[in-house]
Amino acid sequence: WQGEPVFPNWKGYVDDTLAMNHMYTFVGYAGQGTLCVEPEAGVTGFNLFVNNRQINTAAMAAGGVWNVDISGQTINGRNTIQVGGIRPRGKKVTVRVGYPTVQEGSLQDVGIDRDALELLEQIVQADVNNGFPSAQMAIVKNGKLVYQNAWGKVNSYNPDGTPKTDSPAVTNDTLYDLASNTKMYTANYALQYLVTQGKANLDSRLVDLLGSAFVEDTIDITYNGYENPGLKVNKQWKAELTLRDILRHQAGFPADPQYHNDSFDQCAQKTVPGATNVLFSGWDGSAATRAATLKSIFKTPLMYKPGTKTVYSDVDYMLLAFAIEAITGKGLDAFLKETFWDPMGLTHTTYNPLLNGFAANDCAATELNGNTRDGAISFTGVRTATIQGQVHDEKCYYAMGGISGHAGLFSNATELAKLASVMLTGGYGENRYFSRNVMDAFTAPKKEDAANWGLGWWREGDNQRCWYFGTQAPSNTIGHQGWTGTLTMIDPVENLVVVYLTNKINSPVTDKAANPNNFNGNWYTASTLGFVAQLLYQGLQNHGTDPNNAYSALLEDMAESKFALVAEGGSVPATHPLVRSGYAVLEAMAAHANSTHSYMDRNYFNDALTLLDDTRDAEELAKLKKMLNKF
């Protein structure tokens, strides 16, 4: 329950503010809510108000339990219950308040302009038409699921990079590899719950949770270019590490020590053919290898003095997974399933989908040639086939058996939006997950000069995360991103959750010699994540005016910006994904003009065609001219 106040004097004493003794505030949304009212035996009458609206209590007999529908009285945000006039004096009335749940709704219900979403759809679809793999999106506002959509195929390319023609379409049920969004909705959620329950303390030391080996087994590694204070000092540093340090990404661990890679040079922090990885734990993903990985983390010396810098490290959240398992005595996946997923009815949220009832085509595929970056990378045991239904992240798959705090979770946009909505309310239905104090502690700026970080959570701050959350998001907007192309955004001011999932790395590597981590999918507007929030807020902020002129002007400006990027790319052919993404913006402009039947949009479109190169883009120019309908 969100609260179980016993009136009067629900705080347990008579407060001299007087009014407080009879009022209790809860978080709710308009159009939903139920109170469970239980008058004590002997009560002959009492008053009940919700947001100053009186509820008829005449039929609520003493000693009974009464479910009261308050959906007609609730508002979005803070709601107030008032209970008083209890007779005879000295008797009590208990009121139990549940948490809001996510219910079906529409964009119109919550004041989001449909045209803004149509513009977004035109951009994503045009990108998909020009080579972007797939995307999926869900929006929850004011406790209502108001938008779901999906674009593209579950697996868009063959291993040789040619388009795959026999792949099924993505649906709203398709599971995506969430990559680092896993961090928030597994390790952070688990710790927020455990701290709320009093079962964990953020200032608990890791050595006390995991045993003395966390410190004593540390070995000496000379990291190139780092302080390297010596083994004795390094052990002293590790001995004082707390959960809070880990959550801040300021614990001192290297970003990516690759415990699974037998030829990874820990001093150089890169793969060196013929090198021996002194922290190698295994690559088969077995339970034994997962246990060995914990021992490898124990051996890992810190790279810098804790608290002196922020280094985003997957090791931090691998370690948190083990800490949570030590606190709960359960596997991380089992704990999350029984605590969150099952009570919330989340049937498409899981680790290791192929081991939990899902088929490969239930999942959006990621890399085309295993973890090889199209043949640029090799290590013992590396996967070479297209990854689908298995976690892409190497450390999670090879070293952690697919179950970790840093990666491994799969879900779809709709279920993840429901899960993320808990950060707006603290619970779901009759399930209390996080206290307000705990949510505030985890989402507040971790330091005065680091407003873009909470404890694990990414924060908008002063436009410091606008590439992800847009420029209109308030400073306390939180969320995360994932390397596979995933975004979650939670805006507590607007009671808004946006989940946008892509599998942008389900595409060829653009130039594996220049950068084996840059996939074709990275070049498209649909991969930039923040454009979603930017357009959505446009649809929230029209203030009763017709926003279409602004949308049309913005679309041409986006085209100009895209072709400025094309120009920066130098002499690139028409087949390059950067150029294809430019074509996609122009095709979105054509689709927009066709939908609005506006001569202004036609003029914007024709003006944008001058951005094309007469020679390189001749074929596309002819195609675009045919796309514009006559009206």
Residue ranges and their predicted role:
Residues 1-47, 68, 72-126:
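Beta-strand-rich recognition domains
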Residues 47-57, 142-143:
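Short strand-turn-strand beta-turns centered on an Asx-Gly dipeptide
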Residues 56-63, 152-159, 504-507:
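A short acidic/small-residue loop/turn micro-motif
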Residues 65, 130-138, 157-246, 303-316, ...:
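Short active-site loop at a secondary-structure junction
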Residues 72, 86-153, 165, 308, ...:
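Catalytic loop of the DD-peptidase/beta-lactamase superfamily, centered on the K-T-G motif
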Residues 155-156, 217-475:
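Short, surface-exposed loop or secondary-structure junction motifs
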Residues 570-576, 593-600, 613-621:
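Charged, low-complexity interaction regions
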Residues 583-590, 606-609, 613, 621, ...:
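Residue-level detector of alpha-helical secondary structure
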